[in-house]
Curated annotation (Swiss-Prot):
<feature type="transmembrane region" description="Helical">
    <location>
        <begin position="226"/>
        <end position="246"/>
    </location>
</feature>
<feature type="transmembrane region" description="Helical">
    <location>
        <begin position="248"/>
        <end position="268"/>
    </location>
</feature>
<keyword id="KW-1003">Cell membrane</keyword>
<feature type="transmembrane region" description="Helical">
    <location>
        <begin position="180"/>
        <end position="200"/>
    </location>
</feature>
<keyword id="KW-0808">Transferase</keyword>
<dbReference type="InterPro" id="IPR006369">
    <property type="entry name" value="Protohaem_IX_farnesylTrfase"/>
</dbReference>
<keyword id="KW-0812">Transmembrane</keyword>
<dbReference type="InterPro" id="IPR044878">
    <property type="entry name" value="UbiA_sf"/>
</dbReference>
<dbReference type="InterPro" id="IPR030470">
    <property type="entry name" value="UbiA_prenylTrfase_CS"/>
</dbReference>
<dbReference type="InterPro" id="IPR000537">
    <property type="entry name" value="UbiA_prenyltransferase"/>
</dbReference>
<feature type="transmembrane region" description="Helical">
    <location>
        <begin position="120"/>
        <end position="140"/>
    </location>
</feature>
<dbReference type="GO" id="GO:0048034">
    <property type="term" value="P:heme O biosynthetic process"/>
</dbReference>
<feature type="transmembrane region" description="Helical">
    <location>
        <begin position="153"/>
        <end position="173"/>
    </location>
</feature>
<feature type="transmembrane region" description="Helical">
    <location>
        <begin position="53"/>
        <end position="73"/>
    </location>
</feature>
<dbReference type="GO" id="GO:0008495">
    <property type="term" value="F:protoheme IX farnesyltransferase activity"/>
</dbReference>
<dbReference type="GO" id="GO:0005886">
    <property type="term" value="C:plasma membrane"/>
</dbReference>
<comment type="similarity">
    <text>Belongs to the UbiA prenyltransferase family. Protoheme IX farnesyltransferase subfamily.</text>
</comment>
Amino acid sequence: MSISGKLLTEDNQLISPVATVYDYIALLKPRVMSLVVFTALVGLVVSPVVVDPLYGFVAILCIAIGGGGAGALNMWYEADIDALMKRTQKRPIPSGKISRGKALIFSSILSVLSVFLMGVLINWFSALFLAFTIFFYIVIYTIWLKRITPQNIVIGGAAGAFPPMIGWAAATGTISLDSFLLFLIIFMWTPPHFWSLCLFSSSDYEAAGIPMMPNVRGERSTKNQILVYAIITAVCAIGPYITGYAGIIYGISSTILGGMFVYFAYRLWKTDTHDETVPIAKKTFFFSLFYLGAIFGILLIEFLIWHFIIR
């Protein structure tokens, strides 16, 4: 038998489930980490420096380890509120599969190791950038902002937007306007992405006492801000083409995709009741995932075609 993720023997004695490799992988937030790895890879590849494949692999591996360590640290700190939310109750710590102590040790080792290896094997500028990103995500966002302000995801979203700049820094040892534009796309995309999620899962956040925008300012204010941020995101996404860094394929694609993103946000803005809002919010949320992946994917593909096939 099982009760709330705990296992019972035949005589009803409570025992802790044994953690598996998959539980420790889940602790790394693999879905979030996959986005971190992908955007970092794009930043590394589209930089002006052509890196050796092995060098690039090591750099991305270090970023992945750091992203996973940060995700695990986040789960360690938020174990109390994860236990209150249906969406997160089955995570390794609240389900009792991994203790908070083990999670802290595991995540700390990964975080420190990623920065050390990045510095020794790649360069110390990108290593310090990675360390700052981990610090920002855990201390600024997770510990400080998330539980006190509905603007948590706006400011804290910077942590999720840094990876392409870290990838760029790994290749070049510096940052530039072009890498900052990649950061800006993700930074502006984050609020409409997460707030559309909150519009159809607000009860979860409310139960955990997290002040997300729909619960604090209401659905109408949230929809207004989603539309504004979607427009800003669409404009920022055209930036690499305007500056001349990206080509016409990216320029046309980012314009079309940006228009679609704004259209979904506009449809959401037009809804009045909660029942009308939920299905459109879900569509907006899932399209936002596709949108970001497509923007970075097209940028990467166009760059590879131009530099390694046409040239």
